[in-house]
């Protein structure tokens, strides 16, 4: 068995608040809102040298080499989404909760594993 590759990294986990409830009542409009939010979040994560390594529905998990970069990315995309929500007239206003955690992680290919991912 090969040696496990580890490194210290900051994990950012973002999740849309009440996404399932929005989908129950306004499925298509909620999906459009989610796409709008991802069009905001993804480039901001990239701007701060983050790497999205997992998405599922309304959740995003990204790896950063710095807690400061992860925090700044979260603050920036939250502010832009807040502005988007203030202007949105027809589609649901989606809010995002974010967890950030610095820990030793296991890297296997493009995937990241470990307790640090779970905590974030």
Per-region residue spans from a language model:
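Catalytic beta-strand-to-alpha-helix segment of the class III nucleotidyl cyclase homology domain
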Residues: 39-42, 61-120
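Catalytic NTP-binding/metal-coordinating core of nucleotidyl cyclase/transferase enzymes
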Residues: 1-73, 79-80
